[in-house]
Amino acid sequence: MMRLSIGYPSKEEELRLAQNTLDGKVVSNISSVINTEEVLNIREAVKAVIIKEEVLAYMQEIIAKTRDEEAFVIGASPRAMLSLMRASQAKAYLSGRNFVKPDDVKALVGPVLRHRLTLTSEARIGNEDVDKILTRLVTKVIVPR
């Protein structure tokens, strides 16, 4: 659904990981923080988060802009739209709201779409960047009130 970058471990952390693997040490003190029923309940609660028509139209317009962008080989698919919709609902839920705001959508455009879009050869040669293009496209779409 999303592509996030968490970076690399520090030199020390990476060496410790390698040494623990060589020594056959496994993490044994892992305990669950949530059970299956709770996951299913949260999933249903996220699906119940309201997306007003104008916010849905805002999402669709952003998706459509990717299809018109010459720097992309092909624009975002309808499934990308659905992923943006679900991710926005989850963000709203985690923020303690039962409705999606345009800011939720804006915050997730990069994480949801960046791995779904491929730059053209010309764009790559011109040192274009998917995230910068997405930011530019989002600024071209009127934010609903």
Enumerate the predicted regions with their spans.
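Conserved AAA+ ATPase core "coupling" helix
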Residues: 1-49, 53-61
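C-terminal engagement/docking regions of AAA+ P-loop ATPases
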Residues: 66-145
